[in-house]
């Protein structure tokens, strides 16, 4: 590969991901090999291959136990986290506790048990997005750098784990940025020179798995986040879950059968519910029809929009709390908000729009940006800014983001002493002097927490370290200087220094237990390479088989009496010659590249197909296409060559 490709922007979503790049003075959102501009955040493992994206999601009903999704709801969380425990009950794939209470996902791949961390699954989705961009930008320019987005309300460990996922995917993560802030860029970029002056903009971002609200002021290309609030576990999937439960109960009532015992039935139902939910955003009623859903029972039923709203009403209302909190934190009245901007697929739900509009006293909501693509768009702009690519159109944009949670340390009696309050603009650095609690105390334990509660036990411990070697002195005399430093990714470094001795100790909070070590990341990078090689190998085998099948089927066809008698001698000779040549080449080049196999197949088809077609039109009538359709069937399927061989249509 020659020169480096431009840096890309990736929206790594709970349910779908999206990638964009700044090109030709604007952002281009890149479609994947299936022609879709968003890609399911799904990874599937089978006896023969690994599938990512559409191919993985399309076969999920056939393979629910080994198709992994929702990695974003696991990343940076502990196994014992109540949220993780609740999710495990809903997932068809197996999650168990690993070392340091880190969740591990267990699947079977090529008939062997494999164990993955959430970072690894996310890295596979990132690799897919990277490859999507790569295919569009051309093989001569290698994609290396990316800006990756996270929910604004993600905490320190979730951010760090996302950054690690990027490293495992072989990407240099230039910056982790917040999703609503990225969406705000997408919204504000075209208004930069509109002369409107300062605008207060509320971004309401409700996606597949997470929810964020951010309030920004945008003026002349300066995007300043005033406050942010949200829920890292609220989104479209939770609405789907309500529908699944509703219909599972209905099924139980009607047929006295519990379909929840079958992962496959449950998955088919969930897919139908997701579809029904989308339909209900534009229709007042919809039906669900699933043949032979469970124990031979055909399930046909319907649901109205009103019933769906009733099932999810508490969740919809829950979306309004962060809006209030955000305004309160920004010390802003709702009447002073100029624009309320919708982002994320779930903002298409009419009831959510209505509640939000009512909250803002009937104000028109702004739907000017694409809710599925705005985040990747903003990330691509930020990537261009950070690499100096974007030209004057974007280079003078300035993003001022904030840290979502208060950060501090534990002082005597388990009290949370805050050094950096929530919604502080980042990057930032804060110092404070502490002292010992008892006479002649030789060391102090610095425990770092994030959260809003007064006592540390109610907050989240990010990490701890000791500062030792303090000379004997009465309590309160030693001076220990503690420095909290948050970088532009929202990731925290803490250091402490004993002023008398100059003893220092520091931690990047992320060295906390459960964080991947350098060695682990290195190992995962190598494994990612290995899986990629596996995928490549499979494509090779498929391409080789296609050529081989075609050649042998075609030779058998032209040797059949029916066909042979119709062929002119010259046609037969040229075909025999070409087929023998192809078989000889195959024999000698078992390890050729995919492109070579495909090239030979094309050449062969170019010669043989017209002759055979002429023959059939002339009425040789030899039962269908040769060899059961070698002509069509032998070509690699669907561009990617790795699509599922069969899929269920609900």
Curated annotation (Swiss-Prot):
Induction, as annotated: By light as well as by elevated temperature.
Gene3D superfamilies to which the protein is assigned, alphabetical: 1.20.1270.10, 3.30.30.30, 3.30.420.40, Actin, Chain A, domain 4 (3.90.640.10), Substrate Binding Domain Of DNAk, Chain A, domain 1 (2.60.34.10)
GO molecular function: ATP binding; ATP-dependent protein folding chaperone
Region (Disordered): 623-650
Highest taxon of the lineage: Eukaryota
Gly residues: bias regions: 623-642
A cellular-component GO term for this protein: axonemal central pair projection
One Pfam match: HSP70
Keyword annotations: ATP-binding, Nucleotide-binding, Stress response
Family as reported in the entry's similarity comment: Belongs to the heat shock protein 70 family.
Name assigned to this protein: Heat shock 70 kDa protein
Source species: Chlamydomonas reinhardtii
């Amino acid at each position: 590969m020659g020169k480096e490709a431009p840096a890309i922007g990736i929206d790594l979503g709970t349910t779908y991901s999206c990638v964009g790049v700044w090109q030709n003075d604007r952002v281009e959102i890149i479609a994947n090999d299936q022609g879709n501009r968003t890609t399911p955040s799904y990874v599937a493992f089978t006896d023969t291959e690994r599938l990512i994206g559409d191919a993985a999601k399309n076969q999920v009903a056939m393979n629910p136990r080994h198709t992994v999704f929702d990695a974003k709801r696991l990343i940076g969380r502990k196994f014992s986290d109540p949220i993780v425990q609740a999710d495990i009950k809903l997932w068809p794939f197996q999650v168990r506790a690993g070392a340091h209470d880190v969740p591990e996902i267990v699947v079977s791949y090529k008939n062997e048990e494999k164990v993955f961390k959430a970072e690894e699954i996310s890295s596979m989705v990132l690799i897919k997005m990277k490859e999507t961009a790569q295919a569009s930008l051309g093989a001569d320019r290698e994609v290396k750098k990316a800006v990756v987005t996270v929910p604004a309300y993600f905490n320190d460990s979730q951010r760090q784990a996302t950054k690690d996922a990027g490293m495992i995917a072989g990407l240099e993560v230039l910056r982790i940025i917040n999703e609503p802030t990225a969406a705000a860029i997408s919204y504000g970029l075209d208004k930069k020179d509109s002369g409107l002056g300062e605008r207060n903009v509320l971004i309401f971002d409700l996606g597949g798995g997470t929810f964020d609200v951010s309030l920004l002021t945008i003026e002349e290309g300066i995007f300043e986040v005033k406050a942010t609030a949200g829920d890292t576990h609220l989104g479209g999937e939770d609405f789907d879950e309500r529908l699944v439960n509703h219909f599972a109960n209905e099924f139980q009532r009607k047929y006295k059968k519990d379909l929840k015992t079958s992962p496959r039935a449950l998955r088919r139902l969930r897919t139908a519910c997701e579809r029904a939910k989308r339909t209900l955003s534009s229709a007042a009623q919809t039906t669900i029809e699933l043949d032979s859903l469970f124990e031979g029972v055909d399930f046909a039923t319907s649901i109205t929009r009103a019933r769906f709203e009733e099932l999810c009403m508490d969740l919809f209302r829950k979306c309004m709390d962060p809006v209030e909190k955000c305004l309160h934190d920004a010390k802003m009245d709702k009447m002073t908000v100029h624009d309320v901007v919708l982002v994320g697929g779930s903002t298409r739900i009419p009831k959510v729009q209505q509640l939000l509009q009512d909250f803002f006293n009937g104000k028109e909501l702004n739907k000017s940006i694409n809710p599925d693509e705005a985040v990747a768009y903003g990330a691509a702009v930020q990537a261009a800014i950070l690499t100096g690519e974007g030209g004057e159109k974007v280079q003078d944009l300035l993003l001022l983001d904030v840290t979502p949670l208060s950060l501090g340390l534990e002082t005597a009696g388990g009290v949370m002493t805050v050094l950096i309050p929530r919604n502080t603009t980042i990057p930032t650095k804060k110092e404070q002097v502490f002292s010992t609690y008892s006479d002649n105390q030789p060391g102090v334990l610095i425990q770092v927490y994030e959260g809003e509660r007064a006592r540390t036990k109610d907050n989240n411990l990010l990490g701890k370290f000791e500062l030792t070697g303090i000379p004997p002195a009465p309590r309160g005399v030693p001076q220990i200087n503690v420095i909290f430093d948050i970088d532009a990714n929202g990731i925290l470094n803490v250091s402490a220094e004993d002023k008398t001795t100059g003893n220092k100790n520091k931690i990047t909070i992320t060295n906390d237990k459960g964080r991947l070590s350098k060695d682990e990341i290195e190992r995962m990078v190598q494994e990612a390479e290995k899986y990629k090689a596996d995928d490549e190998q499979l494509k090779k085998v498929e391409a080789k088989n296609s050529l081989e099948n075609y050649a042998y089927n075609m030779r058998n066809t032209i040797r059949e009496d029916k066909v042979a008698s119709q062929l002119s001698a010259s046609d037969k000779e040229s075909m025999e010659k070409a087929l023998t040549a192809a078989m000889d080449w195959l024999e000698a080049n078992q390890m050729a590249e995919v492109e070579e196999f495909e090239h030979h197949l094309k050449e062969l088809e170019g010669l043989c197909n017209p002759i055979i077609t002429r023959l059939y039109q002339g009425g040789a009538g030899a039962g269908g296409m040769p060899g059961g359709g070698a002509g069509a069937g032998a070509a690699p399927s669907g561009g990617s060559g790795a699509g599922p061989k069969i899929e269920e249509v609900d």
